[in-house]
A protein has these predicted regions:
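Hydrophobic or amphipathic, alpha-helical segments that drive membrane association/targeting
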Residues: 1-138, 173, 178-244, 248, ...
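C-terminal capping/extension segments of zinc metalloprotease domains
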Residues: 1-9, 252, 256-266, 270, ...
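Short pre-active-site segment immediately N-terminal to the catalytic Zn-binding motif
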Residues: 93-100, 149-162
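Active-site recognition of the HExxH zinc-binding catalytic motif
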Residues: 109, 147, 162-170, 174, ...
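Envelope-exposed proteins and targeting segments
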Residues: 121, 141-143, 287-289
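Membrane-embedded alpha-helical segments that form the functional core of polytopic membrane enzymes
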Residues: 145-152, 226
Length: 339
């Protein structure tokens, strides 16, 4: 398949998934507002009718809770890529005292900056043995690129070029900002669920004489829990699907930048053949899994919430002739202890 066609398809699928997420969130908020605004009709019948006064009170409250949770997450994520790199144990590669491997990495970053038309970002080195990298930041101006020691020690110059080109694609295509928007929305829904949990606990422990009021509090708490946690669950599923499409887009764009499909294909094959794979050991590695070149952590929910496509599928999209075997990769211990 033509790599420009792959880019077009990935962008189209991303747009559909983002639209689905927006519609899902709006529907969830609308249903929640309506559920709290239903009342019995005044004509003596048992039919339910919509109390518009209640809508005027409930709607701003529900929207306000979701927005508050989203804004708190925004404030946390806007700190820039530097904060994320440091949380993952990254070390800034300074102008002085670079090793030959570090200098080669900086040269490649500068080459890819020129190819993509983006300013040269700050570069961090992670001490991990796994072959991995990431781009983080809210805008190209505060973006950083992080690369593991395993990547710069094990990959050839061409393979490392493919990895860096992939990360520049994420910066160029605005994937960092897109991820931040989705994370903020999901966090807002999660806060709605947490608010429901608090109401449920308080209502169930209440000694109020009016049992109907107590029951109403319990029901409100249960409904908010279901709405918030279900919303964040399905939002996370959509976010993971969007992330997988952006990985395909970044792979295809990396080929465009390097003009060499085997550069990124070779790096992916080495990940498959390396004992450490693309593993990142930092305590908060899972929090930033969607940023990595390849999955950096593993969990029981991998298939459901996978932020990256299957390694073999990514390779076959680039190298249709691949026979399915991974090269055996050994990493010299002496190179891993430089940090």
């Amino acid at each position: 398949m033509n790599f420009f066609e792959q880019q077009r398809q990935a962008r189209h699928r991303t747009a559909l998934l983002v639209l689905l997420m927006i519609l899902s969130v709006l529907s969830l908020i609308t249903i929640t507002c309506l559920a709290f605004s239903l009342d019995h009709a005044n004509d003596g019948s048992r039919r339910l009718t919509l109390n518009w006064q209640a809508v005027g009170v409930v709607a701003p409250l529900i929207i306000g809770v979701v927005l508050l949770g989203s804004l708190v997450k925004y404030a946390e994520l806007r700190a820039g890529g530097k904060v994320i790199a440091e949380k993952l144990g990254g070390r800034l590669i300074n102008h002085g005292g670079r090793t030959l491997e570090e200098q080669r990495l900086i040269n490649i970053v500068e080459e890819m900056a020129l190819a993509s038309g983006i300013a040269v970002p700050t570069v961090y080195l992670l001490p991990d043995e796994g072959i991995n990298a990431f781009a983080a930041g809210f805008t190209p101006e505060d973006a950083v690129i992080g690369v593991t020691q395993g990547a710069i020690s094990l990959l050839t110059r061409e393979e490392l070029q493919g990895v860096i080109a992939h990360e520049f694609s994420h910066i160029y295509n605005g994937d960092m900002r897109l991820n931040m928007h989705m994370l903020a929305i999901i966090s807002g829904l999660l806060v709605l669920g947490l608010a429901g949990s608090l109401i449920l606990v308080k209502a169930s422990q209440s000694n109020h004489r009016d049992q109907r009021l107590k029951l109403a509090g319990v029901l409100i708490g249960i409904f908010l829990c279901i709405a918030g946690f279900a919303g964040s669950f399905f939002g996370s599923l959509i976010k993971a699907a969007v992330s997988r499409q952006r990985e395909f887009l970044a792979d295809a764009t990396a080929v465009q930048y390097t003009r060499n499909p085997q550069s990124i294909a070779g790096a992916l094959k080495k990940i498959g053949g390396h004992a450490q794979g693309s593993h990142i050991k930092a305590a908060r590695a899972g929090e930033f899994s969607h940023l990595y070149f390849n999955t950096g952590v593993s969990s029981a929910m991998d298939r459901l919430f996978a932020t990256h496509p299957d390694l073999s599928e990514r390779i076959r999209r680039i190298d249709a002739q691949w026979d399915g075997t991974f090269p055996h990769v050994e990493i010299p211990r002496s190179q891993l202890k430089r940090n």
